[in-house]
Amino acid sequence: MKLISWNVNGLRACMQKGFLDFFQETDADIFCLQETKLQEGQIALDLPGYHQYWNYAEKKGYSGTAIFTKEEPIQVTYGIGVEEHDHEGRVITAEYSEFYFVTVYVPNAQRELTRLEYRMQWEADFLAYLKKLEETKPVIYAGDLNVAHQEIDLKNPKTNRKNAGFTDEERGKFSNVLASGMIDTYRYFYPEQTGIYSWWSYRFKAREKNAGWRIDYFVVSESLKDRLQDAKIHTEVFGSDHCPVELDIEI
C-alpha cells in the first residue's frame, strides 16, 4: 500500500498550485490532508475511485483534516472523543480489516508558547486514544505533528530550543509515543539522514536555503515493523509550506 500525508495549508490555495497533479500522479491507496481550512460545502472534489471523509473546524478558515481512500473503511470516526479537543477538526480515524488509519493535525504550541499547556494535555489524551485503538488492531497514524523530534530534524536546533515545535516538553511527548511501542517510520529507514525536512517558513527564503523542520510523520505500531517497505519525504513537491510525506507498507 502507498500512503500519503500532506499539510496543504489551505486546500483551495493548494489546488491552484498543482494539488490534483500530484494526487493523480501518486495514485495512493490512502491520501490524507491536514490544514484544509475549509467549511462543509466550500469545495467539491471529484476524485473517481476514492471515498472522501472530511473533518472541519468550527472556526472558519482554520485547521481541518481529510482522508481519501480507495478501499471503503469498515467505519470512520471524527475526533478522539474528548470534548475539549474535538472542535477543531484535527483527527479522522478510518478502520480497516487489519489496522486503524488515523490522520492528525496536532495543535501548535504557538509563539510565546501560549498553547503549550493545552498541547501537553492534547498529547496525553491523543496517546491514550491511540493505545485504546491498539487494543483491537495495529495503528498507522500520519500528519503534521508539529514537533521536530531530534536535533537532526531541523536546520537550526540551537536557536529554536525554546520555540514551539522544538521545546523539551514537546520532544519529550513524542519520545513517550515511541517508547510506548510505536515507530517513526522515516527514522526507521534513515536513522541518521540530515538535511531532509517537510516544512519551511514562508519567511526569510527558508525553502530556498533549506532551513526547514521535519514535523510531518507516519508513525506505526511496532507490530507492523516487518511490513514496512519505505518512507519518503517529497521535498520536490511545492504547493504548500509543507511537502507531502509517504509510507509504503505491505498490508
Label for each model-derived stretch:
Residues 1-47, 57, 62-63, 176:
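N-terminal, active-site-proximal structural segment of metallo-dependent hydrolase catalytic domains
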Residues 1-9, 98-110, 142:
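Active-site-proximal beta-strand elements of phosphoester/diester hydrolases
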Residues 7, 23-41, 101, 130-151, ...:
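Active-site beta-strand/loop signature of hydrolases that rely on acidic residues for catalysis
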Residues 37, 42-109:
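Structured beta-strand-rich core segments of catalytic domains in phosphoester-bond hydrolases
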Residues 51, 125-211, 215:
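Metal-dependent phosphoesterases centered on the DNase I-like endonuclease/exonuclease/phosphatase
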Residues 60-75, 204-226:
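Conserved beta strand-loop-helix elements of the APE1-like EEP
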Residues 70, 94-97, 221-222, 247-251:
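Active-site beta-strand termini and strand-to-loop segments that position acidic
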Residues 81-82, 107-123, 158-163:
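Surface-exposed cleft-lining segments at the edges of enzyme active sites
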